[in-house]
């Protein structure tokens, strides 16, 4: 018997397609009428939050934070290093948007590669942002502005104010909430599956 779904986040690391599948699976589970609760003890990363947004309630440790800032990427460029050690790459490249060899032949990202990278990351971020906004009943544009304003991470009190989390609780308080939802006595252990 499953009463609900409790997700405790600790740094989900998965490809965007995998995250999307899990997000959709959580939405399907939610259609059963059973509850979903999400909890972040320390820092919640962007992937964690994307999945947590499906939950009926998002709980966060009062000293926790969320890293929610959009998507980006970084490519190491090695041309100067290769020149310094005397390695000459033999590169065959056809086409403007063929950028796999750029790290060996350039010192910085080409404009064509920047354009295509911004385009595909933009598509992924827009989907994540729109899902989070819909799940949390926020405006996509407002969420985007909020994410653009973050320098490091959002602290717990700001997240509560912006309605990105529902309640700030410590782990033992989270267990009390789960006991109440599952009708488990205080002296009994909760049954978790991981």
Regions from the PLM with identified roles:
Residues 59-60, 165-171:
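Short acidic-hydrophobic, aromatic-tinged amphipathic segments that line or gate anion-handling sites
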Residues 1-139, 144-153, 179-194:
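Small-residue-centered hinge/linker elements
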Residues 149, 156-159, 168:
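PDZ peptide-recognition modules
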């Amino acid at each position: 018997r499953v009463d609900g779904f409790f997700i405790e986040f600790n740094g989900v690391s998965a490809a965007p397609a995998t995250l999307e599948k899990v997000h959709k699976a959580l939405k399907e589970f939610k259609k059963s009428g059973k509850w979903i609760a999400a909890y972040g003890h320390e820092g919640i990363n962007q992937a964690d939050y994307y999945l947590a947004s499906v939950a009926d309630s998002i709980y966060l440790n009062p000293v926790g934070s969320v890293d929610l800032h959009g998507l980006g990427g970084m490519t190491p460029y090695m041309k100067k290093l290769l020149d310094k050690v005397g390695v000459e790459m033999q590169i065959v490249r056809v086409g403007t948007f063929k950028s796999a060899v750029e790290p060996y032949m350039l010192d910085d990202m080409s404009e064509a590669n920047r354009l295509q990278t911004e385009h595909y990351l933009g598509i992924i971020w827009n989907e994540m942002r729109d899902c989070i906004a819909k799940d949390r009943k926020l405006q996509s544009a407002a969420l985007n502005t909020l994410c653009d304003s973050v320098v490091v991470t959002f602290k717990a009190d700001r997240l509560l104010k912006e309605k990105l989390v529902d309640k700030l609780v410590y782990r033992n308080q989270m267990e009390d909430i789960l006991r109440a939802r599952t009708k488990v006595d205080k002296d009994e252990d909760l049954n978790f599956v991981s």
